[in-house]
Amino acid sequence: MRTFLPFLVLFVGTAACSAAQTSSTEFAGDPAGGGPGAFGGASNGANGDADSGALAQPGTLTAGAWDDNRNYDVFTDYLSKHVPQKIPFAHDPQTTAEDAAHLLFAGDRTAKALLDVAIVIDTTGSMGDEISYLRTEFQAIASAVGARFPGAQPRWSLVAYKDVGDEYLAKPFAFTANPADTQAALGTLSAGGGGDYEESPEEGFKALNQLQWRSGADVAKLAFWIADAPQHPWRTQAFADAIDGSRALGVHVYPIAASGADEQTEVSMRSAAQVTGGRYLFLTDDSGIGGTHKEPLVPCFFVTKLDRAVARTVAIEMTGTYEEPAPADIIRTGGDPKNGRCLLGNGTQVDVF
């Protein structure tokens, strides 16, 4: 079985506008609004502000996180019960890709010395807010990463992607050691195009795989894919192939589900995270801005500010060991985490992330 190195990529998805939107920029999510996790979260998130175009300050967005490799039985149960379309990843005849990833990524990992970071953004019509939020949050996140790991020589890159028939399918920006260059590149992007719910994330991943990543076992490489829509059903194999390409490079995909994400979006995101050794992140209504965010079908999680969640995941990748958020950073929980675990109603325990 091959082993893969971890890389850092940030994906921001923007599904197209339609009459089903809850605001001028986002599709409707769960009509019930943010609530406890599917297995009984501790509290409900506040409903999102109806004015999703309101300007956010740095450190405003909130998010939870979940690790399907540490909780593989929950993941396989989820796939068996809730999967509209399973992702056909490549695998050896002796095992599935998911089983192989679980064996590789379930425990502690090797510490890394260097860091490559790519931001991949879906720039179709419905997530103009998320592009704006990313511009607001990015510099603070980059500064926090640089301050904690000054010797990691972090490099930043950007890939914008749209949908078939739009102005472009993917627009990559080369790696740079200066976060200000990436901030400037973000400023050139605008939301537009699309036309239906599904988009073309496979094109973003294909462009991601062509970036000039640093090689070596001491390089940490992650992927944060912020989106509110999955791939087109007829492009699922192409999506799986692109994720397999990222996996072969050692890219760890960290999806971040935005408002309007449906069940197939969660399936695609969690599958991409699990098979590459990333974790699943999801925006929540606790920020009070944007549209309604779907509560994921995961039983145990902490909600913190998004910038803290991203910084924590980078730290875990760089050090190779798990760390919980600081108690002061926890806004609420899904489930009742105690000593790093939640006890479910059926008597089993799961690990919090």
For the regions a language model picked out, list residue spans one by one.
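Hydrophobic helical h-region of N-terminal Sec-dependent signal peptides
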Residues: 6-10
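C-terminal motif of bacterial Sec signal peptides marking the signal peptidase cleavage site
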Residues: 14-16
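Positively charged n-region of N-terminal signal peptides that target proteins for export
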Residues: 1-4
